[in-house]
From Swiss-Prot:
Its EC number is 3.6.5.3. It comes from Gracilariopsis lemaneiformis. This is Elongation factor Tu, chloroplastic. The gene is tufA. CDD domains: EFTU_II (cd03697). SUPFAM superfamilies: P-loop containing nucleoside triphosphate hydrolases, Translation proteins.
């Protein structure tokens, strides 16, 4: 469930596969889910390269993953692959956090991975001109501050002090944004594409939940009947 919720918001993804073990059952599941929720681009990282002595084995794993990607509609032949070891890179950075590119082969492989992401996954065009809208993904309370809701802003721009509506499931209510945070940094504004935490004035945790949306007042109307296309997953 968490993988689907997160993947549905992605502009691209890094598929991590063990170079030592090859594709696992969850590898197939993640590729399928990525396709079904509309992840447009994937870059593959073959992890644990330090455990593979045979270059042919590494090539075989890459071939397997490319075929698997092709089976689910991704361009397997064109997707970038980067091999490395996240553990070895982390160990070296932990020992020397000022390490620069070109000074360690394992750290360089992570740089190469991010190069592949930058080159293969295009920077998306954000819809910042339209009115603010964000689906609620999670809600939690911060002692002494209030209720925070998290999610990905679908469109528009939001600022501290703005008035918004909480729409869906219950009576529509109005509140004021008293704080914005992203990746533990306080912001003055958030915009389309940001995964953000929004601190709401006078709202209790019990009053808001996943399935509701935050929106500019008067722009979203809740409905009890609608048409939808549903993809059902079994356990």
């Amino acid at each position: 469930k968490n993988m689907i919720t997160g993947a549905a918001q992605m502009d691209g993804a890094i598929l991590v596969v063990s170079a030592a073990d090859g594709p696992m059952p969850q590898t197939r599941e993640h590729i399928l889910l990525a396709k079904q929720v509309g992840v447009p681009n994937i870059v593959v990282f073959l992890n644990k390269q330090d455990q593979v002595d045979d270059e042919e084995l590494l090539e075989l794993v890459e071939l397997e993953v490319r075929e698997l990607l092709g089976q689910y509609g991704f361009p397997g032949d064109n997707i970038p692959f980067v091999a490395g070891s996240a553990l070895r890179a982390l160990e070296n950075i932990t020992q020397n956090n000022t390490i620069q590119r070109g000074e360690n082969e394992w750290v360089d492989k992570i740089h190469s991975l991010m190069d592949a992401v930058d080159e293969y996954i295009p920077t998306p065009v954000r819809d910042v001109e339209k009115t603010f809208l964000m689906a609620v993904e999670d809600v939690f309370s911060i002692t002494g501050r209030g209720t925070v809701t998290t999610g990905r802003i679908e469109r528009g721009i939001i600022k501290v002090g703005d008035t918004i509506e909480i729409v869906g499931l219950r009576e529509t209510t109005t509140t004021t944004i008293t704080g914005l945070e992203m990746f533990q940094k306080t912001l003055d504004e958030g915009m389309a594409g940001d995964n953000i935490g929004i601190l709401l004035r006078g709202v209790q945790k019990k009053d808001i939940e996943r399935g509701m949306v935050l929106a500019q007042p008067g722009t979203i109307t809740p409905h009890t009947q609608f048409e939808a296309e549903v993809y059902v997953l079994t356990k």
